[in-house]
Amino acid sequence: MKPSTAFMAIADYLEGEKSSPIRHEYLGGQIFAMSGGSEDHNRIALNIASWLKFHLRGSGCKTFIADMKVNISIAQRTADLFYYPDVMVTCDPQDTEKFYKRYPCLIVEVLSPSTESLDRREKWLNYQTLPSLQEYILVSQSAMKVEIYRLDAGGNWSLEILEADDLLVLNSVGLTLTIAEIYDEILLP
């Protein structure tokens, strides 16, 4: 991602994103252009989103893929952030904004070489400030490997690393997937 050098107001950012051919993430007044994803990146995200959409039909929960922003307000830094998660689920009736969501319970990022460190550090640190978030998932494109961070009843995050023969149990939405379902039609080396 390449940063813009000018400070931008949130309202201007949101308005500009409606017509921009390139998506941008917003970090406290600066915007960063996003690169496109690979075919495998898109297919993995679509596989996960499809299972979620089907499972959650009629539940009041909503599944979003790639083009829906998540808004994070960080009071101690008096900054607003807007990211585009690869997949996101919100079940909160307060989440009524048309172009971004504030209360996701589940966020999925498919790892790319150009964004992996961002997904693992900056985004993860900021996503943890979302009081509604229960699970954060990182999915590899280069191997059948899924990492899931879960929030427990005591407010602590734990990490589980899953591989080819494991099951991904999504407590936040009551869905269990095989790792093979996530990587359906993906040819790995």
Q: PLM features: residue spans?
A:
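Gly/Pro/Ser/Thr-rich low-complexity, intrinsically disordered segments predominantly at protein N-termini
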Residues: M1-P189
